[in-house]
């Protein structure tokens, strides 16, 4: 705070986390704000400081200091970078454990140097120099149980934003290993499709390694087993997980967090609290500064692109679309796939775009299905409006 004064002044309203370097004086001064956490985390909160003086006719002025949590369940790291990130949740609360370790990665050499510093509430890892991909990193307690987990998303170039109708969207799906300004190349590569999320969860699932717009949909093929030959291979840490599992038990916040490689086919009502419509919920899987889009935001996007130079990339093995926007930039929309909620099997790889929204209606999710206006809020023929269905993830800026 740059205070200009020739008379006595004072600052009131300081708190234990929002202190000032000088609370009173008699001349112009630069007062520093001293912001700290409380040892439990950086929680969303605010403090109002009142600055008053003896100068006649000058009313006291108020300054509001807002502290926001920087916690996120996805950490974006550039290839070759060593990154330390706070062991905390999206609400800012620190989580405590005894060791950090990887659970699965898309490449055995993707992550190294994993370390947990309990005194600093910090996890450190190093990403390989010439690789892109994803890895799930977890903090474990003394008994080997998962306390919390984070997706470490390794990229060669940091994601940027594409603004559509006033809404800033990330230029790629969460977990995408490949992003190119050449839309045709991008949508034909399964590495651009990213990862897949059950509603209300932060733990992702891998997708397909085969794209086929003319197979693997109703009446045209037998669906392979949920995590069988059609699923992309990942590397599992055998000391931490038995690999992908299917469970008919009820999914709760505790079971989902404690079993990050288990696909649940039944969900509890409590999972509706995992994501927040229009905000960043506790299990929001987007990086810092981003959140899961609402159904209304999907509708806005679809309405805009349908009237602004939409181009359908209907060649090869996908029906993916890409859009050269009149406002500038290119929005690439892979026709991803989804994992069916009652068995985890892959449906429509390369045929239909299927993405998460944070909106629930009647207790059921409203996913975006296909790149056509109207499909984000209507229940289409093949809609899977189940909490357990896993869709792709494209984030919007908070």
Can you describe what each PLM-predicted range is?
Residues 71-96, 139, 144-193:
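GGW-centered surface loops in extracellular recognition modules
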Residues 174-176, 256-398:
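C-terminal, surface-exposed recognition/capping segments
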Residues 36-42, 128-130:
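Short, surface-exposed loop/turn segments at beta-strand-coil junctions that are enriched for proline
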Residues 43-55, 131-142:
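A short beta-strand micro-motif common to beta-rich folds, especially ectodomain repeats
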Residues 5-32, 70-124:
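Surface-exposed binding patches on compact interaction domains or structured appendages
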Residues 159-268, 296:
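A short glycine-rich, aromatic-capped structural motif
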């Amino acid at each position: 705070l740059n205070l200009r004064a020739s008379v006595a002044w004072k600052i009131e309203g300081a708190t234990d986390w929002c202190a000032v370097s000088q609370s009173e004086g008699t001349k112009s001064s630069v007062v520093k704000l001293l912001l700290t956490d409380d040892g439990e985390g950086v929680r969303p909160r605010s403090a109002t400081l009142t600055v008053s003086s003896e100068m006649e006719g000058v009313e006291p002025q108020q300054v509001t200091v807002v502290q926001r949590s920087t916690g996120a369940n996805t950490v974006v790291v550039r290839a070759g970078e060593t990154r330390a990130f706070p062991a905390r949740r999206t609400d800012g609360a620190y989580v405590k454990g005894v060791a950090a370790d990887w659970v699965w990665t898309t490449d055995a050499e993707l992550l190294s140097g994993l370390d947990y510093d309990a005194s600093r509430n910090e996890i450190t890892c190093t990403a390989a120099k010439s690789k892109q991909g994803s890895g799930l990193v977890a903090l474990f307690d003394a008994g080997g149980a998962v306390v919390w987990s984070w997706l470490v998303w390794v990229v060669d170039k940091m994601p940027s934003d594409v603004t559509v109708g006033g809404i800033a969207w990330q230029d790629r799906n969460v977990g995408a290993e490949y992003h190119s300004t050449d839309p045709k190349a991008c949508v034909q590569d399964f590495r651009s499709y990213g990862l897949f999320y059950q509603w209300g969860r932060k733990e992702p699932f891998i997708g397909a390694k085969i794209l086929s717009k003319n197979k693997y949909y109703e009446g045209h093929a037998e669906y392979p087993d949920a995590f069988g030959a059609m699923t992309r291979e990942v590397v599992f840490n055998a000391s931490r997980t038995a690999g992908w599992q299917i469970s008919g038990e009820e999914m709760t916040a505790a079971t989902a967090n404690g079993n990050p490689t288990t696909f649940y086919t039944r969900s509890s009502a409590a999972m509706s609290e995992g994501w927040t419509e229009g905000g960043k919920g506790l299990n929001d899987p987007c990086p810092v500064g981003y959140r899961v889009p609402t159904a209304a935001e999907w509708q806005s996007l679809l309405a805009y692109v349908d009237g602004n130079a939409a181009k359908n990339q209907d060649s090869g093995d996908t029906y993916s679309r890409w859009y050269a926007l009149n406002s500038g930039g290119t929005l690439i929309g892979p026709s991803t796939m989804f994992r069916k909620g009652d068995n985890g099997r892959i449906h429509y790889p390369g045929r239909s775009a299927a993405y998460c929204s944070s909106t629930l209606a009647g207790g059921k999710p409203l996913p975006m299905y296909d790149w056509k206006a109207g499909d984000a809020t209507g229940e289409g023929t093949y809609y899977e409006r189940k909490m357990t269905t896993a869709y792709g993830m494209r984030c919007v800026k908070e």
